Amino acid sequence: MQPSYLLLTFAIIFVMVIMYSPAVEAKAGADADADAHADAGCSQFRRMRNLCGGKK
């Protein structure tokens, strides 16, 4: 059985999609709005921890 060029092309595209997908996810995490929400959540956590007598 001889593999066709079309099958080889699809296999190469599939491998490239797998290789480059983590880079796309990393860019999505660098959103300014998401960072602002994360900072707000941390400051609320720190206030609650300080109110309950936790470490500063």
UniProtKB/Swiss-Prot annotation:
<keyword id="KW-0027">Amidation</keyword>
<keyword id="KW-0732">Signal</keyword>
<keyword id="KW-0964">Secreted</keyword>
<comment type="function">
    <text>Venom protein with unknown function. Does not induce paralysis when a high dose is administered by intrathoracic injection into the blowfly Lucilia caesar.</text>
</comment>
<keyword id="KW-1015">Disulfide bond</keyword>
<keyword id="KW-0800">Toxin</keyword>
<feature type="modified residue" description="Glycine amide">
    <location>
        <position position="53"/>
    </location>
</feature>
<dbReference type="Pfam" id="PF17499">
    <property type="entry name" value="Pilosulin"/>
</dbReference>
<dbReference type="InterPro" id="IPR049518">
    <property type="entry name" value="Pilosulin"/>
</dbReference>
<feature type="signal peptide">
    <location>
        <begin position="1"/>
        <end position="26"/>
    </location>
</feature>
<dbReference type="GO" id="GO:0005576">
    <property type="term" value="C:extracellular region"/>
</dbReference>
<dbReference type="GO" id="GO:0090729">
    <property type="term" value="F:toxin activity"/>
</dbReference>
<feature type="propeptide">
    <location>
        <begin position="27"/>
        <end position="40"/>
    </location>
</feature>
<protein>
    <recommendedName>
        <fullName>U4-myrmicitoxin-Tb1a</fullName>
    </recommendedName>
</protein>
<comment type="similarity">
    <text>Belongs to the formicidae venom precursor-01 superfamily.</text>
</comment>
